Amino acid sequence: MKTAATFSALQDLDADLLIFPFSSEGLKKAASPVLEAAGLSDAPLDDFKAAAGDTLVLYPRPGKLRAPRVMLVGTGEAGSLDDWHRAATAAASRAVDLEARRIVFDLPAAGGKAKPGIEAVAETLVEGCLFGAYRFERLKSGKLDKGEKKTAAKGKAKKAEKGIDLLTLRVPASALAAAEKGMASGLVIGSAQEMARNLVNLPGNHLQAEDIARAAAASGKQYGYGVTVLRKKEIESLRMGGLVAVNQGSLNPPTFTVMDYVPKKKAKATIALVGKGVTFDSGGISIKPSEGMGDMKSDMAGAAAVIGAVEAAARLALPVRIIGLIPATDNMPDGNAQKPGDVITTYSGITVEVGNTDAEGRLILADALTYAAQKYSPDAIIDLATLTGACIVALGYQVAGLFSNDDALAGAIEGAARDTGEKVWRLPLWELYDEQIKSDVADVSNTGSRGAGTITAAKFLEKFIDGHKKWAHIDIAGPSFPAKGAAKVNGGSGFGVRLLVELLRKWS
């Protein structure tokens, strides 16, 4: 998708769709001039309440506008950045359905309601349009599509990829530079989120640990940051017992990918981001029920978010050093797979009783967290993981669970969540939960007694941060791959990319 900003008159804009955002506050007063310019009455406003994400498509009278359609889209009463993102997502999704490839967002229609500022709104609109226009159809052959034209060369169905080719923002002339700046950063962040979504949506037979490593390496090569990939022999020599144990049942070797973005000027801080990279989680010997197992291709969403965040940070040239760490494997049942009751030794030297092989994510994260703390001594460690179904039970599909041993870090993450709309809710790390993960035969168990499953998982991870004083764990099990109808998107959402980038920008 290309972007542009303009201050041309409405009548001069050549587009497939003109989009007018309106607040629910003072709707009729703001919308009437737009409808008049399109040769329409106020009557359609009876069907449009302008709640965030509401849309209404109308058809101008001939000769009034060059665009064949206009759309009213609601930004709610508050007009927050989250509301603007919802508006852009809904508008872009509807535009794709209408096959409108050139769209214009008219910000003056908002009547000065772009409260967060033109630059921030422009950035959010681009991110939202990329989000709403996204379709994952790369694995469709098109052979069963009806009515498609055949190519002369191969006689196969030829279908244009769905999407938006050009997004233009119409702004006042005085705001042109701010709009262009915001659109540029929005394109970077939105594209990084889209890349993460593509990775999450790939099925297990198309994405293995090696493919995650290749994706990180390709990003590093293109955007100028270092990537090192440790493979099975190196992982074994480092005695990363958690990653090795989870991989035992797999035919595909594990990888441990290290991304290292170093700014050109002296870094203001060093932040370690750790992403869980389980490319498919069958549960191992403690096998999952068949219902919904196909969605376990998304168990590497934390890894995808970390790759996206590091990529965006590099492209935005943030003045913070970022270490991205991704332990990756699938979790499969096999004669050689780890078994319930096994005791393994992690990279830290801490021994773990495997109470359940389906609690595998915390085992590979244990190695990565200790590695991050000991090798890099970062100013903060943040891990993202689709760790527990218990987090979905507690918070649903639109909110991630947040745990931290540092109030300032937790507050910064909560602030970034408010700014981006990628919602988090902090849960406790009280010592009393340690009782639930005690083991009689090892230092700790990877499963807890009944109840508080998302908390006991976080308490397990806490034991592997090597005493680090500034650590946060974000359980993204719900929002990374929402159930159908549970959120504004189906499939992989790329949750965490925008959250992390906003956090890193504020850090700098």
From Swiss-Prot:
Question: Gene3D superfamilies of this UniProt entry?
Answer: Leucine Aminopeptidase, subunit E, domain 1, Zn peptidases
Q: Where in the cell is it found?
A: Cytoplasm
Main subcellular location: cytoplasm
Cofactor dependency = Mn(2+)
Q: Which UniProt keywords apply?
A: Aminopeptidase, Cytoplasm, Hydrolase, Manganese, Metal-binding, Protease
Sequence positions that bind Mn(2+) 2? K276, D281, D299, E360
Annotated catalytic residues? K288, R362
Manganese as a keyword of this entry, yes or no, is: yes
* Highest taxon, organism lineage: Bacteria
Give the reactions, separated by semicolons, that this protein catalyses: Release of an N-terminal amino acid, Xaa-|-Yaa-, in which Xaa is preferably Leu, but may be other amino acids including Pro although not Arg or Lys, and Yaa may be Pro. Amino acid amides and methyl esters are also readily hydrolyzed, but rates on arylamides are exceedingly low; Release of an N-terminal amino acid, preferentially leucine, but not glutamic or aspartic acids
Entry EC number(s): 3.4.11.1, 3.4.11.10
- What GO biological process term is on the record, naming one? proteolysis
UniProt GO cellular component terms: cytoplasm
Q: InterPro entries, from UniProt? A: Leucine_aapep/pepB (IPR011356), Macro_dom-like (IPR043472), Peptidase_M17_C (IPR000819), Peptidase_M17_leu_NH2_pept (IPR023042), Peptidase_M17_N (IPR008283)
Query: Which segment of the chain is annotated as a signal peptide?
Result: none
In its UniProt record, a GO molecular function of this protein is: manganese ion binding
Instruction: Provide the binding site for Mn(2+) 1.
Output: D281, D358, E360
In the record, the note on similarity to other proteins reads: Belongs to the peptidase M17 family.
* Purpose: Presumably involved in the processing and regular turnover of intracellular proteins. Catalyzes the removal of unsubstituted N-terminal amino acids from various peptides.
Q: Which PANTHER family match?
A: CYTOSOL AMINOPEPTIDASE (PTHR11963:SF23), LEUCINE AMINOPEPTIDASE-RELATED (PTHR11963)
| The protein's name in its UniProt record | Probable cytosol aminopeptidase
- What species was this sequence derived from? Chlorobium luteolum (strain DSM 273 / BCRC 81028 / 2530)
Q: Which gene encodes it?
A: pepA
